[in-house]
Design a protein with these regions (language model features):
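Substrate-binding clefts and catalytic carboxylate motifs of secreted carbohydrate-active enzymes
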Residues: 6, 13-47, 59-61, 78-196
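Glycine-rich phosphate/diphosphate-binding loops that line cofactor/substrate pockets in enzymes
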Residues: 1-2
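Short active-site oxyanion
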Residues: 62-67
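Short acidic loop-to-helix transition motifs that present clustered carboxylates
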Residues: 47-54, 72-75
Length: 196
């Protein structure tokens, strides 16, 4: 069952004035359309926002019932101040990188791959550490984000990117890599360490 309706995802529209913009009005319109498909008329609307600033057009629209951030776990502590009284979820989180059965040492070091999202990342092994110590430049490890959830009671939950590896968006490697390394379950349907 759908518990929350989504009016937008991967949205990163930052406002530079106090006026409602076309993007804010569009968010209001999309939220209205989404609510029309709710047979009970009770489900709240969220959006997966890449920009967690309260000046984001989606938040400024007033149409978002549940604040949703994609990543940005370091901003969560500011949610009660920036969005008083609003429920909060991680609409997309983690994006840790792992290959089942491959471990990079030292295990207590964190590896960002690539260092910045626009830079290439090269390692001839085409593998990522399964110690939950490797993540994309915009994200965090499972443990790091889970720690934020555990220590902030107002966090209603998180949607981890992703449950399964998938063909496409090869991250952190480029060709000849053909799939993501994000999943807690690999392409063969076998759990990685972070699954447990």
């Amino acid at each position: 069952a759908n518990l929350i309706l989504n009016a937008g995802h991967d949205a990163s529209t930052l406002a530079h004035s106090d006026e409602l913009s076309v993007n804010s009005l569009l968010t209001q319109h999309l939220a209205q359309i989404v609510k029309e498909y709710d047979p009970w008329g009770t489900r709240p609307v969220t959006a997966g926002c890449n920009e967690p600033d309260p000046k984001n057009h989606l938040f400024k629209s007033g149409a978002i019932d549940v604040i949703g951030f994609n990543y940005h776990h370091q901003w969560v502590k500011d949610v009660p101040k920036n969005f008083p009284g609003k429920p909060f979820i991680f609409s997309e989180s983690v994006s840790a990188l792992q290959t089942r059965g491959f471990y990079m040492m030292p295990s207590d070091s964190i590896y960002k791959a690539p260092k910045e999202w626009w830079l290439p990342y090269c390692d001839p092994s085409f593998k990522c550490s399964a110690y939950d110590n490797m993540h994309a430049s915009w994200s965090s490890t499972h443990e790091e984000t889970w720690d934020v959830v555990k220590h902030h009671d107002f966090v209603g939950g998180q949607f981890i990117w992703t449950g399964f590896d998938y063909i496409g968006e090869p991250t952190p490697y480029a060709y000849p890599a053909r799939s993501s390394y994000f999943g807690i379950i690999d392409l063969a349907g076998l759990p990685k360490d972070s699954y447990y």
